[in-house]
């Protein structure tokens, strides 16, 4: 059926008016399917269900066992993972309401974007990791134990680190630091932890760093100074003798096993960290000459983050275990093998080893592969070492959700209702184009229809550049082309959803390394998504967008925005790195944060901590501005240019509120503009002109 005639008929479409005495060819009458109506949309939703949305967004794949779609069509958090019973689930939409509602309605008056942290999820991740290694050790007859450390670089938030130390204390969980401030916070937190928990000191080191690590040892913290560079050995020897503190030393080996993915770069032979075989031998010799070879007790290595397969993992661990055995043979007092990070997260739920955003294994398979690889090598001649891992990404990724609003949409084509055409010659040209398009539609040549409309638009653009076509005419032609695209059944253009967020601040890896995170609506999942969209942030930067999604998609199924109803989206599995890496591009600061725990009662939760995001004044201070002085300058300016005292005071009050609010967009209902509105007529009554 020539569907063009269904949308283009004898009367000009709304928004079109052709000037001149032009007679258009009568459209060919065709019967066909009528356009969709509201009833059709309702029928579509009647056949939709939350379970279909769960399948569409693959929630069970990437979110299990911590996230699910509930019967109300909202995302629920399952705080205890697989052990969560149905009445313990927490509805994310209820958390948003609690956080954002005004205090007069029992809310917390927090502005979005919002990070919701779930310490119960954090606890479950720690326990699950420990259980996986415990099972692998017991079932395989391994003759030592596992005790992990959390690398604080993944998320240095005070309460995250303190929770990990608290939850990990029963199984001697420790911390890893890679800089002096990280070491200070690790030392402080571990004072309340298990005394057997390891404090691993990685990273580049100067005399102050090494002295601080030695002091940690003196404070009865189980501290290991890991040699990353050969030159560090001399400093460790010199300072330990000067301070009369015997150190525990580890060394980081640079392996030959290859991890070819994006996250394997630091592991390659030209990588940033680690000692080659020759340098390892020199370190051993130097420690022996200093009479401190017995201090060498730990071997550390790192294959790379997001290790995709257990085969690659076992290969690297096996190589490192052989180095460990050689160090024992050379006389070192070896006790611990630290396998570093690499325990991956399945960001898209595909369980694939061919992607940087997925892994083919779970916690149990990972632990079994590590234990078996170490055991196979050490069974030859060496006592089984304590196994340590630095699995930060796997521990904290699931524990937080970033929630943000969509504040508007636009077509990526710039389509819209066109204005009237007013030039006689253009109408004649359109008449010829219309006749040709009708002929193509009659023949069913819809592909040529699309090609011709694009050519027509290009001709009009060239005429516009030459000044022979005005902007209204150009817009009208673009609108006609969009109508034709829809009429012939072309795929609807992708919408741009404008979100109240800074990608650079809250999802920096999406911009920096094109990392893909699962992003989905957190509500309305009982409705069928009717459009596809990309996300565009508030920054004045073309890179401030997300147009890559899980499963290789370049757009995301979304719902039509409804007037007066906020549309909330959530980014999941972003609990590692994103907060620490985020900047203040365009002076947008971080999100508000709530800490949410499951409490007694069906679907009950408690917000145990709530922190508003940085205000405009806060982010200005980051760049060395002085908001208090800025406010005084503007206040004096208002007094100078607004002669009415009350009006000047009201304007100053409005400025003060802006300094105190977050930089993100406010809904009109949240914006208290009464004082400013009162100031404007007062000034106008005095005959003053407002300039902008």
From Swiss-Prot:
Class of enzymatic activity (EC top level): lyase
Binding site for substrate: 337-347
Cofactor: pyridoxal 5'-phosphate; Mg(2+)
Enzyme Commission identifier(s): 4.1.1.19
Matching PROSITE patterns: ODR_DC_2_1 (PS00878), ODR_DC_2_2 (PS00879)
Residues modified to N6-(pyridoxal phosphate)lysine: 153
Keyword Magnesium: yes
Catalytic activity field: L-arginine + H(+) = agmatine + CO2
Protein family per UniProt: Belongs to the Orn/Lys/Arg decarboxylase class-II family. SpeA subfamily.
Name this protein carries in UniProt: Arginine decarboxylase
Natural source organism: Glycine max (Soybean)
Higher taxonomy: Eukaryota, Viridiplantae, Streptophyta, Embryophyta, Tracheophyta
């Amino acid at each position: 059926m020539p569907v063009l005639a269904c949308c283009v008929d004898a009367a000009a479409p709304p928004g079109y008016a052709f000037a001149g005495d032009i007679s258009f060819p009568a459209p060919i009458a065709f019967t066909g399917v009528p356009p969709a109506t509201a009833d059709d949309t309702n029928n579509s939703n009647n056949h939709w269900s939350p379970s279909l949305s769960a399948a569409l967004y693959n929630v069970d794949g990437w979110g299990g066992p911590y996230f699910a779609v509930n019967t109300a069509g909202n995302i629920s958090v399952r705080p205890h993972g697989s052990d969560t019973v149905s009445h313990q689930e927490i509805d994310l939409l209820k958390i948003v309401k609690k956080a954002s509602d005004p205090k007069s309605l029992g809310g917390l008056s927090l502005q979005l974007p919002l990070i919701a942290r779930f310490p119960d999820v954090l606890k479950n991740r720690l326990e699950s990791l420990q259980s996986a290694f415990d099972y692998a050790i017991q079932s395989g007859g391994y003759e030592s134990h596992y005790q992990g450390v959390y690398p604080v670089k993944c998320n240095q938030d005070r309460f995250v680190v303190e929770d990990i130390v608290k939850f990990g204390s029963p199984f001697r969980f420790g911390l890893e630091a890679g800089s002096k401030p990280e070491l200070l916070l690790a030392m402080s937190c571990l004072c309340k932890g298990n005394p057997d928990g390891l404090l691993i000191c990685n990273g580049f080191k100067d005399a102050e760093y090494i002295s601080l690590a030695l002091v940690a040892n003196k404070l009865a913290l189980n501290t290991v100074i890991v040699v990353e560079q050969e030159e560090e050995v001399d400093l460790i020897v010199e300072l330990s003798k000067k301070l009369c503190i015997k150190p525990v030393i580890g060394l980081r080996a640079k392996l030959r096993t290859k991890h070819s993915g994006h996250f394997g770069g630091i592991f390659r032979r030209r990588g940033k960290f680690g000692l080659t075989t020759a340098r390892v031998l020199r370190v051993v010799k130097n420690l022996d000459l200093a009479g401190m070879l017995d201090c060498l007790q730990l071997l550390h290595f790192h294959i790379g983050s997001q290790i995709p397969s257990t085969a690659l993992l076992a290969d690297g661990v096996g190589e490192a275990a052989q180095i460990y055995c050689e160090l024992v043979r050379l006389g070192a007092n070896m006790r611990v093998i630290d396998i570093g990070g690499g325990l991956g997260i399945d960001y898209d739920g595909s369980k694939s080893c061919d992607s940087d955003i997925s892994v083919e294994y779970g916690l149990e398979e990972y632990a079994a592969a590590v234990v078996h690889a170490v055991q196979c090598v050490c069974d030859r001649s060496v006592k089984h070492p304590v196994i340590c891992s630095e699995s930060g990404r796997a521990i904290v990724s699931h524990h937080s959700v970033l929630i943000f609003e969509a504040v508007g949409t636009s077509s990526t084509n710039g389509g819209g209702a066109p204005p009237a055409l007013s030039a006689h010659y253009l109408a004649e040209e359109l008449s010829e184009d219309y006749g040709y398009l009708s002929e193509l539609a009659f023949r069913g040549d819809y592909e040529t229809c699309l090609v011709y409309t694009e050519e027509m638009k290009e001709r009009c653009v060239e005429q516009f550049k030459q000044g022979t076509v005005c902007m209204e005419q150009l817009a009208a032609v673009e609108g006609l082309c969009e109508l034709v695209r829809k009429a012939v059944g072309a795929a609807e253009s992708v919408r741009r959803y404008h979100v109240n967020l800074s990608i650079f601040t809250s999802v920096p890896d999406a911009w920096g390394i094109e990392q893909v995170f699962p992003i989905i609506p957190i509500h309305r999942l009982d409705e069928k998504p009717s459009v596809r969209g990309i996300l565009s942030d508030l920054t004045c930067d073309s890179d401030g967008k997300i147009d890559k999604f899980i499963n290789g998609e370049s757009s995301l199924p979304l719902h039509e925005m409804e007037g007066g109803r906020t549309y909330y989206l959530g980014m999941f599995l972003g609990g590692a790195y994103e907060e620490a890496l985020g900047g203040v591009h365009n002076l947008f600061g971080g999100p508000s944060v709530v800490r949410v725990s499951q409490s007694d009662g069906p679907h009950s939760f408690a917000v145990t901590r709530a922190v508003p995001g940085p205000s405009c004044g806060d982010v200005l201070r980051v760049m060395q501005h002085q908001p208090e002085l800025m406010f005084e300058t503007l206040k004096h300016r208002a007094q100078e240019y607004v002669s009415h005292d009350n009006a000047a005071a009201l304007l100053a009050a409005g400025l003060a509120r802006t300094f105190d609010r977050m930089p993100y967009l406010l809904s009109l209902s949240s914006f208290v503009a009464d004082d400013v509105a009162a100031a404007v007529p007062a000034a106008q009554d005095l005959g003053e002109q407002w300039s902008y």
